[in-house]
Amino acid sequence: MRSPQSILAIVAFATTAIAGVVPSTEKRADDIPELDVKLTQVEGTLVKAVVTNNGDEDLNILNLNFFKDTAPVKKVSVYSQGAEVPFAGVRLRHKTSGLSPEVFTYLGPGESFEDEFDVAFTADLSQGGRIVVKAEGFASTTDTDGDTLSGVVHYKSNELEIDVDGKAAAKNFASLNQFSKRTRLTGCTGSRGSAATRAIRDSAPLAAMAAGAARNGGRAFTQYFKTNDQQVRNLVAARFDAVAREASSTTSGRTTYYCDDPYGICSPNVLAYALPSRNIISNCPAYYSLSHLTWRCHGQDRVTTSIHEFTHTPGVFSPGTDDLAYGHQAATSLSTWEALNNADSFSLFANAVYLGC
């Protein structure tokens, strides 16, 4: 385990480094259609989102980690007094191939779908007062009849202002906030326990290998992080070093790792998830259908999925990553700043280092 002093040093370095990386203002490719998201208040902290295809192409949009996902995922960012309210829901890693048809929504040009959700469920709004809600990011897409992610589309919403009743919001937040601290590795018995333990332990040397590759920079680093700048290389390496330290022990550390799904979040298309506010990681049944380490560039496996989830948890390295883009095509379309905050950029880079992609 790291000392408090070393943790504070890493946090200070991360905050300074991320602040020093200017988000790219380069325009996205013209052939990527844009989704418009219209946010309106229904009642209290209940919000409706209307997602519209503003492009001239048909879209088959993945709903996992996006609007229409029934899990407590991050659909919007919430701001109070100019600062973002920390997200307290889950971050999912889902399959990038073999996805079920029901997790996609087809939208022709000009067509829309709706979703309603309570922003107080995944953000502590008990202080009440005025908040601002908005959404911007990338949604994954596939061909109309496909089950493999093949593209990405940018989405952006209006800014919605809501006056929050703190007491009512606190009740909604409490319904998600029912987690307790447990031992480092939990519910891990039998073949699944063996598979998870092996994957966690092998995450340590792979993360260390990725840290070394990040410090050296090169083609793969530039592909995923869009720069060969030394400051960015050091920041990426520091996160991988932290993952390697955390994964080196299954009996101590800053995360609680479940081999099963104690909170009922999993679905057939979800591999694992993290609850960053509690530094909790849980594997889903689909995790165990993956190979231990894939021999396919840009592929998914148990080891890099565990690395993906470790990067989400701020107890390992703060701030934890977000889920901005999934898969090679989407991840390599991100700017440097976005890639530094994207879990799949780290897991895909580790895969590239391991296989020499």
From Swiss-Prot:
GO molecular function: metal ion binding; metalloendopeptidase activity
UniProt cross-references to SUPFAM superfamilies, sorted A to Z: Metalloproteases ('zincins'), catalytic domain
Residues involved in Zn(2+) binding: H308, H312, D323
Cofactor binding remark: Binds 1 zinc ion per subunit.
Active site positions, chain numbering: E309
Chief place where the protein resides: secreted
UniProt keyword terms in alphabetical order: Cleavage on pair of basic residues, Disulfide bond, Hydrolase, Metal-binding, Metalloprotease, Protease, Secreted, Signal, Zinc, Zymogen
EC number: 3.4.24.39
Enzyme class at the top of the EC tree: hydrolase
InterPro entries to which the protein is assigned, alphabetical: Fungal_M35_metalloproteases, MetalloPept_cat_dom_sf, Peptidase_M35
GO biological process: proteolysis
Needed cofactors: Zn(2+)
Catalytic reactions of this protein: Preferential cleavage of bonds with hydrophobic residues in P1'. Also 3-Asn-|-Gln-4 and 8-Gly-|-Ser-9 bonds in insulin B chain
Propeptide residue span(s): 20-182
UniProt subcellular location: Secreted
Any single Gene Ontology cellular-component annotation: extracellular region
A Pfam family per the record: Peptidase_M35
Cysteine pairs bridged by disulfides in the record: C188-C259, C266-C284, C297-C357
Position of the signal peptide: 1-19
Job description of the protein: Secreted metalloproteinase that allows assimilation of proteinaceous substrates. Shows high activities on basic nuclear substrates such as histone and protamine.
Similarity annotation: Belongs to the peptidase M35 family.
Name this protein carries in UniProt: Neutral protease 2 homolog BDCG_00922
UniProt organism field: Ajellomyces dermatitidis (strain ER-3 / ATCC MYA-2586)
